[in-house]
């Protein structure tokens, strides 16, 4: 069970308690800090859409510390990021693996960051296949389709050729922060909020 801290703020009407994620949302900060599942994706998407409705021009910050997760859930977040009219600054803290790495790369170019000791990893999609021979063939074809689709997205986000993405993704392909710059996953390694283009990361 995950413990969610609460913070207390002084307001004109007295003290008000809120969970830490709601407090961060006030500063247009969204946190992806676990496996990317459908429930998590729905929460993140709702937060992103809420922030867009509040101010369609102001940057949104997405902090990622995730081992990856479900492809459809990750793609739903990815499509929402691309749907937004504002810039999305992405930050890797800890790790951004699999779908986490794809979401990291989906940020606005020039505003994709990683902290110095963070790690990134890309690989091909995987999944257990059960059922009749016809079912197995259909599921295998779907995995191959998703493999090409994800490679095309990463190619667009990183500037790497699709063929290289597919080759590198055959096995777990790990990168440190500096390597991720060369690969095109991120634009800059930062050790302080002052190093980013977003001067109000935390208000």
From Swiss-Prot:
What EC number(s) would the UniProt record show? 3.4.21.92
Pfam families listed in its UniProt record: CLP_protease
Q: What's an example Gene Ontology biological process for this entry?
A: protein quality control for misfolded or incompletely synthesized proteins
Q: Cite the PROSITE patterns for this sequence.
A: CLP_PROTEASE_HIS, CLP_PROTEASE_SER
Q: Describe its assembly.
A: Fourteen ClpP subunits assemble into 2 heptameric rings which stack back to back to give a disk-like structure with a central cavity, resembling the structure of eukaryotic proteasomes.
Membership in a protein family: Belongs to the peptidase S14 family.
**Job of this protein:** Cleaves peptides in various proteins in a process that requires ATP hydrolysis. Has a chymotrypsin-like activity. Plays a major role in the degradation of misfolded proteins.
Q: What's the protein here called?
A: ATP-dependent Clp protease proteolytic subunit 1
Q: Which organism is it from?
A: Chlamydia felis (strain Fe/C-56)
Q: Which gene encodes it?
A: clpP1
